Amino acid sequence: MSPSDAAPALDGSRAVRAWLFAVAGLIFVMVIVGGATRLTESGLSITQWQPVTGVIPPLSQADWAAEFARYRQIPQFSALNADMTLEGFKTIFYWEWSHRLLARVIGAAFILPALWFWRSGRFKGPLGRQIAVATGLLALEPIVGWWMVSSGLAERIEVAQERLALHLLIGAATFGALIYAAVGLGERPRESASAGFVAAAGALAALIFCQLGLGALVAGLRAGLIDNTWPLMEGRLIPGGVFGLAPWPRSIVDDATTAQFDHRFIAYAVVASTLALAIAARRRAPRSSLARRGAVLAALAILQTALGIVTLVMVVPIEFALAHQAVALLLFGMAVVNWRATAMERRTVTAR
């Protein structure tokens, strides 16, 4: 390939890379808006799934009255919001409507450029498979989202926590898949990253991903509203009743005390793992990009844990809860960057 041929190809990769990062950024915003929707108890305000016509909010007083009437028919209204006015309903409606509107924006921002890049032959080899995975996840997410919402429309006053966790994890997986693909289109320095570092980076990303799911279970079970002390729970390191349901794995999903206990101790494991990775990388190559990524990961993990503690002891103020969720996604994204970049650096050295 001549230099003149290489330049357009490189420019094309840069365009695809920028697009992938941009969509990942939109998903980041989407997750934060989703968190605000949950924290404001707004997620059940729209009781119908209308993928096309739902883009337009109620425009007349009659439309608003009809929408409010539908909300008044579900259990959440009588249990939590029996004194809600139409103006109050509009507030929670717009949170959920904004969340769904952003989902549609993300769909368009992904699908339309993807079709153009595909027709231009930009999705070759592993990148094509990565885009296919991201497409599947994006298509699945709204289906799971409605499945989650529907769980709170009949017998419950909130959505099922396991469906909430799945909804968040699919969003996080899509976010991670886009970042993984985007980092793979960049150039990496020639640094000696051992197979052990690659495996450790992948394991860390998986651990943080699991921690995101545990955080969603804490949110769905309202477990942040109990045991608002730190570092002990109920005055003990291991509180009574942990894993007390039968069979015991049910406690992970259905018991608030167990959910908070799990989330706390996996947080400690994440901090310890990031610190160990940062120290090992610095000892191996102090000035390497691996060492810098390790330092960023450790700093984010410590910040995230501190935000979690503050959120807990202050009994979940919305601003700290949203910051906690935002940094969690940043930490996961950085872990994916580190995993992909470390693997690429190892291949670069091996290929020399």
List PLM regions with ranges.
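Polytopic transmembrane helical bundles with strong interfacial aromatic enrichment
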Residues: 1-352
